[in-house]
Swiss-Prot record:
It comes from Arabidopsis thaliana (Mouse-ear cress). GO terms for molecular function: metal ion binding; metallopeptidase activity. Belongs to the peptidase M67A family. PSMD14 subfamily. There is a cross-link at residue 238 (Glycyl lysine isopeptide (Lys-Gly) (interchain with G-Cter in ubiquitin)). One of its GO terms (biological process) is proteolysis. A motif (JAMM motif) lies at residues 112-125. SUPFAM superfamilies: JAB1/MPN domain (SSF102712). Metalloprotease component of the 26S proteasome that specifically cleaves 'Lys-63'-linked polyubiquitin chains. The 26S proteasome is involved in the ATP-dependent degradation of ubiquitinated proteins. The function of the 'Lys-63'-specific deubiquitination of the proteasome is unclear. One of its GO terms (cellular component) is proteasome complex. The lineage of its organism: Eukaryota, Viridiplantae, Streptophyta, Embryophyta, Tracheophyta. This is 26S proteasome non-ATPase regulatory subunit 14 homolog. InterPro entries: JAMM/MPN+_dom, JAMM_MPN+_peptidase_M67A, MPN, RPN11_C. It comes from the Eukaryota. Its EC number is 3.4.19.-.
Amino acid sequence: MERLQRIFGAGGGLGHASPDSPTLDTSEQVYISSLALLKMLKHGRAGVPMEVMGLMLGEFVDEYTVRVVDVFAMPQSGTGVSVEAVDHVFQTNMLDMLKQTGRPEMVVGWYHSHPGFGCWLSGVDINTQQSFEALNQRAVAVVVDPIQSVKGKVVIDAFRSINPQTIMLGQEPRQTTSNLGHLNKPSIQALIHGLNRHYYSIAINYRKNELEEKMLLNLHKKKWTDGLTLRRFDTHSKTNEQTVQEMLSLAAKYNKAVQEEDELSPEKLAIVNVGRQDAKKHLEEHVSNLMSSNIVQTLGTMLDTVVF
C-alpha cells in the first residue's frame, strides 16, 4: 500500500508523490560484516563453476542503513535459482535453529554468486528479488563473484528492483540527497543487463570493530614454529636430489661462462650475456636454499627425537 501511495501520490495519479510518504534514497548503504563476507566468498568459491545461493540475516537500522551480520547457505545450486526453487521449509527450520544459538536477526535479503561473469541480475534473479520484496520492500539482493575477487579487492554489489510503474510515470526510483550512491561506476555488462532500468545498485560498506580487525590480521599470520615444521622424508629426499642435479647443471654453465670471459673481449662479452641465465646467481640461490632446508629439517628431527 505504501508503494502504491508513493507511486500515484496525492496528485490524482499525476506522478507527484506525497511529501509524507517514505522515499528511498541514493545514500542508502548496506553494511556487511566480516563474518558474512567471508562466508559468502567461501560458499561461492566452493560452488565454482556453479552458482550458489543463500540468505542474509541482519536488520534495517534506519532509512539509510541496512546491516548484514550473518549469512547461511541454501541447498540450491546451478542455474535453477528461481522463485519456485527457494526451499521455504529449510529456511524456516534454519531460522529457528539460529535463534536457539543466539542469532535472532531477521532476513534482510539474499545473495548468490556469479562465478567469473561479474555482478548483475538476470531475469530469473529479478523475479527472485521481487518475491523477496513482496515480503519486505527493502529486501536486498547481493551478487558476489568469487573468481574475479582477489586479495584486497572483492567483486561484490547489492541491488534492488525498480517498480516498472515508476518508470512509466516518469519518476525517479530514488531521491538524491548526497553523492554516496554515485561513488561506484557501473560496469558495461551490468548496464547491458538492465542496471538502472530494471534494478538499481546500492552502495556497500564494511564496518569492523577492533576484535574483527585483530581476527582478520591473524588469519595468515606466521608463527616461529612454522619454520620447524617437518616435511615428509621421501619428499625432502626427492627435493634434495633434484636441487643437486640443477646445481650440477648450473656449475657446468658457470664454468663455461668463466672460460668465455678469458677468451672474449669486454664488448663481445656484454653482447653474449644478454638474455642468458646468470648461472652464478642461480647457483648461489640453490646452495643457500638447500643448506637452509636441510638445517631446518635436521634441527626439527633432533627436537622431535628429544621431546617425543
